[in-house]
């Protein structure tokens, strides 16, 4: 937990391999939720423990499930977006090279696939996530500053 305490932001991935690839790509700790259904609980627990940190949920984009008659939902994207929204965080999803998803939609869903299967490779993991993390940190800092200012204004109003 020291690594998370010292990290500039909390990054959460759905699976272990994805968390590993992201950690390698951004050179920072990443938490694996192990299942899309667990993203919400993990995001809330970490947000409660580290309320001053930006939360980024690096989600799976399960487009292939849209064609499955039993599912017909992009579960990975839905769960990641819900978890991020619940903690005021940001959900991010990998962007693949043109044509890669068309050849194997189920094989190109997450940041591990981006780093290990895409022609863009691990450099793309860094290129796609670092700006998203930096933006989330900047937004979190602004939010904290607004909250402090509002608190000061309330305190000054009570003293009068």
Where do the language-model regions lie?
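TOPRIM fold recognition
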Residues: 8, 24-160
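Conserved beta-strand elements of the Class I
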Residues: 10-12
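Glycine-/acidic-rich phosphate or pyrophosphate-binding loops and their flanking alpha/beta elements
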Residues: 1-7
């Amino acid at each position: 937990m020291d690594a998370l305490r010292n990290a500039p932001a909390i990054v959460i991935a759905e699976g272990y391999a994805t968390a590993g690839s992201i950690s390698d790509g951004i050179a920072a700790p990443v938490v694996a939720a192990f299942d899309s259904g667990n993203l919400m609980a993990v995001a809330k627990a970490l947000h409660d423990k580290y309320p001053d940190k930006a939360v980024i949920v690096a989600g799976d984009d399960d487009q292939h499930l849209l064609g499955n008659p039993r599912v017909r939902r992009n579960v990975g994207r839905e769960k990641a977006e819900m978890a991020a929204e619940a903690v005021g965080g940001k959900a991010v999803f990998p962007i693949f090279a043109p044509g890669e998803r068309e050849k194997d939609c189920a094989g190109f869903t997450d940041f591990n696939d981006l780093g290990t299967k895409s022609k863009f490779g691990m450099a793309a993991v860094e290129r796609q996530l670092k700006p998203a993390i930096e933006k989330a940190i900047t937004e979190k800092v602004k939010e904290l500053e607004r909250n402090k200012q509002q608190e000061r204004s309330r305190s000054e109003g009570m003293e009068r």
